[in-house]
């Protein structure tokens, strides 16, 4: 224990340096040395414990629901709901887009405008009903992203979206679980990239999951839902292939063409190994 180590190494009534964070969004901890403050180490064991404890990080630091104190104050001043903030840490991302969106907009722009408005309402309602959060209304084009602290909630939300009539729109949905980072209220990093590549594998009306998410939802799926193993597939631009699963339910389509895996293509027109022509005049003449 930190307290025991400090108590056993120091005599009573001496000063101890403790790190204090000032003007930061993170709570003070003894490991950070941003600004120095001094407290007196009292002789009483109980007083020492409480003195040191006031510098320790709150027990919920590191959880995806944790919101730094300073940010909570700013949120409260603006009248925002803390529960609707994008979660960080380990979360399950749901990333979806409209299949053949560009073609649909060109062929029937008025119908698509109505369908997109209906989609926005349906997506917002489904995400809220399952405890998810949308960092932004739109991610890229007609795609959207939602974050869930529980993988089972993300799977239930994806299933509800596919069971809802959105014609002429058909959604391609990918689910993946991992560590996420927020930058300007947008998720960045490997997890969002892998989720996007998973979504790109899917067809309209299909929900695909990574192995990480599949493991978490096994035994926790909505009633009558099940998973189908689609095997291991490469993901465009990523070095590690992914074991892909499909979320199935009697109310949604089950059979699809093979996943949209990127076809391998040469990355260079140069030979794999250079050939020297020095001393080979006879052969090349």
UniProtKB/Swiss-Prot annotation:
PROSITE patterns: GUANYLATE_CYCLASE_2 (PS50125). GO terms for biological process: cyclic nucleotide biosynthetic process; intracellular signal transduction. It holds the Pfam family Guanylate_cyc. Residues 92-199 form the Guanylate cyclase domain. CDD domains: CHD. One of its GO terms (molecular function) is adenylate cyclase activity. InterPro entries: A/G_cyclase (IPR001054), Adenylyl/Guanylyl_Cyclase_3/4 (IPR050697), Nucleotide_cyclase (IPR029787). Belongs to the adenylyl cyclase class-4/guanylyl cyclase family. PANTHER family: ADENYLATE CYCLASE, TERMINAL-DIFFERENTIATION SPECIFIC, ADENYLATE CYCLASE, TERMINAL-DIFFERENTIATION SPECIFIC-RELATED. This is Uncharacterized protein Mb0915c.
